[in-house]
């Protein structure tokens, strides 16, 4: 079994040993446009990519450009790790640690730093508000 995934742009990315130099916005956008929310348990195909457009909600609330971009990136780790249903994910602490580490790396790459505690709270509010939109 391979230790890496070949991304849309042809890079060999190791999800267990992520390298920020191999993270490409094109890979994130492409993969998230093809991953279905809710493990496919939705009435019609609804991609993670469509869900992250909750950035519109951040803009409507008058949040900063940084928070709008954070909304676009908040599920970016799923392009490398897939989407694990929340009830199951709660039972996988090591997965959560790896996902958080990768997401932190993505935020640092595209935002310049990780999210502050206040920004994380704002993001969760928007994510929950847009859960089914």
Language-model segment annotations:
Residues 1-133:
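Metal-dependent phosphohydrolase cores
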């Amino acid at each position: 079994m391979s230790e890496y995934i070949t991304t849309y742009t042809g890079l060999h990315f190791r999800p267990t040993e992520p390298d920020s130099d191999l993270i490409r916005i094109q890979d994130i956008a492409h993969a998230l446009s093809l991953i279905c929310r809710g493990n496919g348990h939705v009435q019609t195909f609804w991609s993670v990519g469509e869900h992250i457009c909750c950035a519109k909600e951040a803009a409507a609330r008058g949040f900063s450009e940084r928070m709008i971009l954070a909304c676009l990136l908040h599920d970016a780790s799923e392009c490398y790790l897939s989407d694990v249903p929340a009830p199951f994910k709660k039972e996988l602490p090591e997965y959560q640690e790896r996902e958080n580490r990768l997401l932190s790396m993505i935020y640092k790459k595209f935002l310049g730093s990780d999210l502050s505690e206040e920004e994380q709270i704002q993001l969760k509010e928007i994510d929950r508000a847009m859960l089914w939109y």
